From Swiss-Prot:
This is Energy-coupling factor transporter ATP-binding protein EcfA1. Its EC number is 7.-.-.-. InterPro entries: AAA+_ATPase, ABC_transporter-like_ATP-bd, ABC_transporter-like_CS, ABC_transpr_CbiO/EcfA_su, ECF_ABC_transporter_ATP-bd, EcfA_1, P-loop_NTPase. It holds the Pfam family ABC_tran. It is found in: Cell membrane. PANTHER family: ENERGY-COUPLING FACTOR TRANSPORTER ATP-BINDING PROTEIN ECFA1, HEAVY METAL TRANSPORTER. The active site is at 166 (proton acceptor). Gene3D superfamilies: P-loop containing nucleotide triphosphate hydrolases. ATP binds at residues 40-47. It comes from Lactococcus lactis subsp. cremoris (strain MG1363). It comes from the Bacteria. GO terms for cellular component: ATP-binding cassette (ABC) transporter complex; plasma membrane.
């Protein structure tokens, strides 16, 4: 299978003189078209890993390969074109006076012809349902709308990989759901690979695969159905349990005949509707 991202034995510390490593031998790979989430407690190394992949830190031990090519100081700018990163706070990403200016900014830096930029701006804003807002000032948008524009700015650049670095953590539940729906849609439309750094276990549950980090190391790798199947495993890792897992446990205690495997909220609602219908 085509591995679009390979990470081998990453070791990193923020200060050279420090005895503490933020990452200790992190290794994993992602196949083209996969959605992989990294979860873990604060300080576990999730965001540090994502930023190393995006070439934001120069000095580290180990290997990062993007689409088969090893990341180096010499090729970082070329390889970074294959990656789009959406950060936690959309306000920190805005540079344009209007929504369309902001989406066009990255393309201007890449020297994309004006006619092509105009076409891509409209296509990207349409994909995130923000085309009607293209002449608005970003400051007048809601949090969810701002994050949609940030996503539009990324997909206009035509990356192969999107990295979501806690990109929904500042949104309310409705805004969070809308952004995740939009990203799933554009992933399928543009055949993208997604690496999601998240605290939201319900968000991670929609991934193909989950990596669990603790103290700079990957301590577990599994499909959501396996990882979330037992609440005891999640507690041992030091993480919360998804709402649907807790609800299923309570329902079983009260006599409901439910499968032992993990079900997402939507899957559980569908199952209960069938049983009670």
């Amino acid at each position: 299978m085509n591995k679009i991202l390979e990470v081998e034995n990453l070791v990193f510390k923020y200060e050279k003189e420090s005895d503490v490593n933020q990452l200790n031998g992190v290794s994993f790979s992602i196949t083209k078209g996969e959605w992989v989430s990294i979860i873990g407690q604060n300080g576990s190394g999730k965001s540090t890993t994502a930023r190393l992949i995006d070439g934001l830190f120069e000095e580290f031990e180990g290997i990062v390969k993007i689409d088969g090519e090893r990341l180096t100081a010499e090729n970082v700018w070329n390889l970074r074109r294959k990656i789009g990163m959406v950060f936690q706070n959309p306000d920190n990403q805005f540079v344009g006076a209007t929504v369309e200016d902001d989406v066009a900014f990255g393309m201007e830096n890449q020297g994309i012809p004006r006619e092509e930029m105009i076409k891509r701006v409209d296509e990207a804003l349409l994909a995130v349902n923000m085309l009607d807002f293209k002449t608005r000032e970003p400051a007048r948008l809601s949090g969810g709308q701002k994050q949609r524009v940030a996503v539009a700015g990324i997909i206009a650049l035509r990356p192969e990989i999107i990295i979501l670095d806690e990109s929904t953590s500042m949104l309310d539940p409705t805004g969070r759901s809308e952004i995740m729906r939009v990203i799933h849609e554009i992933k399928d439309k543009y055949h993208l690979t997604v690496l999601s750094i998240t605290h939201d276990l319900d968000e991670a549950a929609s991934s193909d695969r989950i990596l669990v980090m603790r103290a700079g190391e990957i301590i577990k790798e599994a499909a959501p159905s396996e990882l979330f199947a037992t609440s005891e495993d999640m507690v041992e890792i030091g993480l919360d349990v998804p709402f649907s897992s807790n609800l299923m446990k309570d329902l079983r205690t009260n006599g409901f005949d439910l499968p032992e495997k993990y079900l997402s909220e939507d899957e559980l609602v569908e199952l209960l509707a069938d049983k009670l219908g």
